[in-house]
């Protein structure tokens, strides 16, 4: 898979591959030889259904999602590879079925990793087929024959909620990863005299100081002089055994009138799954920022971006505003405004861990209130 984008007007082997997959998925009924308007519309529909950025352009993320979507359970044997892990809708279906029967695969993410292999082994042992951790014909047949044995809500959601509640309301000793976009030579979006790399790093530093004062162990995915790629950020975050991961970005658009703040959590319409903790935290962040600032509420959205999907802890991405909008850029360029954003996020983090009966009205809780309640130092 290459990193080059394929879009309207292109042709060639990659375009043919895209058309073939879209046909198999039922999103195209014709077989165009070039990337025309019908292909672009089909790509947009696919991106929408998969929680990807909807632009009709097939970049590396969309091409990877198309490749994963073409696999159905039974098309191939599934097993743990020592190099590149197997990914696909067939893996997600396997994980979902095992989870429904009470076997812990972790998050249903469509990636065949260690936890999925262990769950397959446990399932194989329970049904009396060869225990090798590989999902071949015999294991698939056993899966198809068995019905659900767990009820009362999706088990993965129940596990995530239970683990979250078990951590208690105090922020002390929790581990939070802060992920400022860009860094090093990558300065990100630049408009109206404001630079993405500087804005997000400044917000992260302000948030880091507040969290450290609350007893939180804080990890940053980058400093000022480096710019890790997405895979490196995911690997780093997973090694910290974090309770929560927060990624900071700004946005841009061709129409300078686009403005406002938005948050994103992991959720897949195609697989009917989402991170319940991620969704709640994204909602809390959105509400706190909008209650304390005049940024437009661009709402909370489920996405399947790898940073949200492949991180072990609940992960939320915050797009702090549009630098291509003069008003948003002016706001984000002010230190006092960035300070309010940092305050909003730390309060949202605390509200995430408070029981509903102890929670406060959006926009009213202050750090001093946490001290008085005995849940900060």
Regions found by a protein language model. Name each.
Residues 1-25, 37-51, 60-61, 68-377:
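Catalytic-site microenvironment of enzymes
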